[in-house]
């Protein structure tokens, strides 16, 4: 009995070996290096080549593509092909049957998105053999870059140049400033008076960032070329934006300043002493008592940070937007955002509309913080914010054309952006009295551009 069982096992092994030898060798090859990079929204082909020792018969073979995302350690089926059956589990996914005859089992995906990055596995079955291969797919988005001059709130002979990069992925990016003078034609990197803000995530998963260069044209040579250089892994070569400094306004020489001062310093001294006595010393106590505890709107929000529903917003982002980005925006009705913040309903509304029209959805939740501050009189009183700022003092209200806009009422915050938190560098201030918590409501879809007053 034992001899017969051993003989049967030996015969089975010989038959299996003969079948495998007859079937031939099956092998799958993917992208060299194991990683494939593709631009966002491109039509991508993920390569998979099948090598078989015999001619392929697609009616008796199977192809299945799987994807494992970067965030979840679980495979999902993307496409399958067996004989005359094929099914796409991702819209538009396809493997060309006529290319498969020559061993090309590549997967085609139109309009690739960021969330579709991950590990792709190509599994090929030619009965009784099976082979597979994997490749990492990375999706990148190239930044769009622009350079502009911010003329809001700058002094004479000063300039604030903004270099904005938007819509890039992944988050890592490098922005540097260089200058090239007539005397030194080789570009050199600038390290002083450069401020680069935080990277802000957009609703589509891409990122934005702004870098600022401050210049005093009276201290720079006319004809100097300045350059903003943007490096990102999606770019083959860096993006470069240039501007040339024009001739600075004439200012007095040191000799002229010295001559003028030597002639007039006596009367200037007496006048200066008089001004100090009249303007500073006499009302000093009254001024201190009145203004020592007053706060700007931005400072008030920072001070009472825990009174707001901040969610995932960051203080440093609010500071950057309020002091750098928003003052450079050209708002309607002649409004301009002050670096210290605002509780003027016209100014806040126009900034809110501008951010929505320009697709700056990540900034809208930070604007909502000023709406929330304005709609809390107790907090405004606690911060000693000027009551005049709580009324419509300039511009044109968004509801001016409405017959029901005779009376201004507090604004509802039901139009905030999805996934938006409220609010930016924590200075240390004196502890305020306890205040009531403010919780703006955040919807699940992008809001409309009009913000009517109820």
Curated annotation (Swiss-Prot):
Region (Disordered): 395-454
Signal sequence annotation: 1-23
Listed Pfam families: C1-set
Domain of life of the source: Eukaryota
Residue span of region Interaction with NCR3: 59-62, 127-130
Keywords: Cell membrane, Disulfide bond, Glycoprotein, Immunoglobulin domain, Membrane, Repeat, Signal, Transmembrane, Transmembrane helix
Glycosylation sites: 43, 57, 208, 216, 242
Membrane topology qualifier: Single-pass type I membrane protein
Chain spans, region Retroviral-Gag-like: 291-429
Subcellular location per the Swiss-Prot or TrEMBL entry: Cell membrane
Residue ranges crossing the lipid bilayer per the database entry: 263-283
Domain notes: The C-terminal part is similar to retroviral Gag protein. This putative protein seems to be the result of a fusion between an Ig-like domain-containing protein and a ERV.
Subunit: Monomer. Interacts specifically with NCR3.
Protein name: Natural cytotoxicity triggering receptor 3 ligand 1
Gene: NCR3LG1
């Amino acid at each position: 009995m034992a001899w017969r069982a051993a003989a049967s096992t030996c015969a089975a092994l010989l038959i299996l070996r003969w079948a495998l030898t007859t079937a031939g060798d099956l092998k799958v090859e993917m992208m060299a290096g194991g990683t494939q990079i593709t631009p966002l929204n491109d039509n991508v082909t993920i390569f998979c080549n099948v090598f078989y020792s015999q001619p392929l018969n697609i009616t008796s073979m199977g192809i299945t593509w799987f994807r494992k995302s970067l965030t979840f350690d679980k495979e999902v089926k993307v496409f399958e092909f067996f004989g005359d059956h094929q099914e796409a589990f991702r819209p538009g996914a396809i493997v060309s049957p006529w290319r498969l005859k020559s061993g090309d089992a590549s997967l085609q995906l139109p309009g690739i998105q960021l969330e579709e990055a991950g590990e792709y596995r190509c599994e090929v079955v030619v009965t009784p053999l099976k082979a597979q291969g994997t490749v990492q797919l990375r999706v990148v988005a190239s930044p769009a870059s622009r350079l502009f001059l911010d003329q809001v709130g700058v002094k004479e002979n000063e300039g604030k140049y903004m270099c904005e990069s938007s819509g890039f992925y992944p988050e890592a990016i490098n922005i540097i400033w260089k200058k090239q003078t007539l005397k030194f034609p080789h570009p050199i990197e600038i390290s002083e008076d450069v401020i680069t803000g935080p990277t802000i995530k957009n609703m589509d998963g891409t990122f934005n960032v702004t870098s600022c260069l401050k210049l005093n044209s009276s201290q720079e040579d006319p004809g100097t070329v300045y350059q903003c250089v943007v490096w990102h892994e999606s770019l083959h070569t860096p993006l470069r934006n240039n501007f040339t400094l024009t001739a600075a306004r004439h200012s007095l020489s040191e000799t002229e300043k010295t001559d003028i001062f030597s002639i007039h310093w006596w009367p200037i001294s007496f006048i200066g002493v008089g001004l100090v006595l009249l303007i500073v010393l006499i009302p000093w106590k009254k001024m201190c008592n009145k203004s020592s505890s007053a706060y700007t709107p931005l400072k008030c929000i920072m001070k009472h940070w825990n009174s707001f529903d901040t969610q995932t917003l960051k203080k440093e982002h609010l500071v950057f937007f309020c002091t750098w980005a928003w003052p450079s925006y050209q708002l309607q009705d002649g409004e301009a955002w002050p670096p210290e913040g605002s509780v003027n309903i016209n100014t806040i509304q126009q900034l809110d509309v501008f951010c929505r029209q320009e697709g700056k959805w990540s900034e809208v939740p930070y604007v909502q913080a000023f709406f929330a501050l304005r709609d809390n009189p107790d907090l405004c009183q606690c911060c000693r914010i000027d009551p005049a700022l709580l009324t419509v003092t300039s511009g044109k209200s968004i509801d001016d054309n409405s017959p029901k806009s005779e009376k201004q009422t507090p604004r509802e915050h039901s139009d905030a952006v999805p996934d938006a938190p409220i609010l930016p560098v924590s200075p240390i201030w004196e502890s305020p009295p306890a205040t009531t918590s403010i919780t703006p409501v955040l919807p699940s879809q992008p809001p409309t551009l009009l913000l009517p007053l109820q």
